[in-house]
Amino acid sequence: MSGRGKTGGKARAKAKSRSSRAGLQFPVGRVHRLLRKGHYAERVGAGAPVYLAAVLEYLTAEILELAGNAARDNKKTRIIPRHLQLAIRNDEELNKLLGGVTIAQGGVLPNIQAVLLPKKTSATVGPKAPSGGKKATQASQEY
């Protein structure tokens, strides 16, 4: 009888991470540890790191989606800092959120003030209508 081990005992369930329970890719346990070690508050609730990890994951996915579109527009398959810069600065809400952030190697948005653009020449304007009493019935030649 001896040496047979425990019989009828319940097998312990496989460990499941808090990230997988919440359906997230970002690490809930690491966020919890960082919240505790950062001394932001004396105590940290169980839901706080899950919520914060979800917010961080959403923001990251949003930025990467826009940066991927910018990379595709430039016919590239790899996202570089320039694509991140274009994605953030062209989006009104992300630009407001990350207004004080400098992205290394990001460059600037292409922007030329309207007053600096060359003026339209008189050659592009069609001939004036005759000043006689009759109105011109000719169709405009401007394209």
UniProtKB/Swiss-Prot annotation:
Its main location: nucleus. Changing residue 143 to F: Displays a reduced apoptotic response. S-140 phosphorylation is reduced. It comes from the Eukaryota. There is a cross-link at residues 128, 135 (Glycyl lysine isopeptide (Lys-Gly) (interchain with G-Cter in SUMO2)). GO terms for molecular function: chromatin-protein adaptor activity; damaged DNA binding; DNA binding; enzyme binding; histone binding; protein heterodimerization activity; structural constituent of chromatin. There is a cross-link at residues 14, 16, 120 (Glycyl lysine isopeptide (Lys-Gly) (interchain with G-Cter in ubiquitin)). GO terms for biological process: DNA damage checkpoint signaling; DNA damage response; double-strand break repair; double-strand break repair via homologous recombination; heterochromatin formation; meiotic cell cycle; nucleosome assembly; positive regulation of DNA repair. The modification Phosphoserine is found at residues 2, 122, 140. It is found in: Nucleus; Chromosome. The modification N6-lactoyllysine is found at residue 10. Residues 1-22, 121-143 are annotated as: Disordered. The modification N6-acetyllysine is found at residues 6, 10, 37. The modification Phosphotyrosine is found at residue 143. A motif ([ST]-Q motif) lies at residues 140-141. Phosphorylated by VRK1. Phosphorylated on Ser-140 (to form gamma-H2AX or H2AX139ph) in response to DNA double strand breaks (DSBs) generated by exogenous genotoxic agents and by stalled replication forks, and may also occur during meiotic recombination events and immunoglobulin class switching in lymphocytes. Phosphorylation can extend up to several thousand nucleosomes from the actual site of the DSB and may mark the surrounding chromatin for recruitment of proteins required for DNA damage signaling and repair. Monoubiquitination of Lys-120 (H2AXK119ub) by RING1 and RNF2/RING2 complex gives a specific tag for epigenetic transcriptional repression. Following DNA double-strand breaks (DSBs), it is ubiquitinated through 'Lys-63' linkage of ubiquitin moieties by the E2 ligase UBE2N and the E3 ligases RNF8 and RNF168, leading to the recruitment of repair proteins to sites of DNA damage. Residues 7-19 have a biased composition (Basic residues). Keywords: Acetylation, Cell cycle, Chromosome, DNA damage, DNA recombination, DNA repair, DNA-binding, Host-virus interaction, Isopeptide bond, Meiosis, Nucleosome core, Nucleus, Phosphoprotein, Ubl conjugation. The [ST]-Q motif constitutes a recognition sequence for kinases from the PI3/PI4-kinase family. Belongs to the histone H2A family. This is Histone H2AX. It comes from Homo sapiens.
